[in-house]
Regions:
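Conserved hydrophobic "DFG−1" position in protein kinase catalytic cores
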Residues: 9-10, 17, 87, 102
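Active-site-adjacent beta-strand/loop module that shapes the phosphate/pyrophosphate-binding cleft
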Residues: 58-59, 68-91, 101-105
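Conserved Nudix-box catalytic region and its N-terminal flanking loop in Nudix hydrolases
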Residues: 14-53
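Conserved N-terminal beta-strand and adjoining loop/helix that marks the start
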Residues: 1-16, 36
């Protein structure tokens, strides 16, 4: 099973959403920044590393707010661990995505998110978490 971390970066009641490029797996889908946990790496360390690589920030990783195991149709599974990020150093810069966007909870529903993220997106929009 693939193990992944993702960040819920919050600023002024907005959440950062990121769109994959057309050259990535599941092109042009929206997601939260993050990535694969490497062998022997702790989830919080992976979260800090991914945010530095993808957005150029040094993040203070907050609480783990959700853990989802998703089975993809046709095979393959992923464990996603979502962490809240309220504080970070540096200015966010888009290093790998087609687009990054600060959105309200309700605006999340209008973006074409990865299937594995949909339950969390619905919970965020409904105010059930964070």
């Amino acid at each position: 099973m693939k193990r992944v971390v993702a960040a819920l970066i919050l600023k002024d009641d907005l959440i950062l959403a990121c769109q994959r490029t057309r050259h990535q797996v599941m092109p042009l889908k929206w997601e939260f920044p993050g990535g694969k946990i490497e062998e022997g790496e702790q989830p919080r360390d992976a979260m800090r590393r991914e945010l530095e690589e993808e957005l150029g920030i040094v993040a203070e990783v907050g609480a783990e707010v959700a853990r989802i195991i998703h089975e993809y149709p046709g095979g393959g599974s992923v464990e996603l661990r979502f962490f809240e990020i309220h504080k970070y150093q540096g200015e966010i810069e888009n290093r790998i995505f087609r687009e990054i966007r600060w959105v309200t909870r309700k605006e999340l529903l209008g973006l074409d998110f990865l299937e594995a993220d949909l339950g969390l997106v619905n919970d965020l929009a409904a105010g059930k978490i964070l």
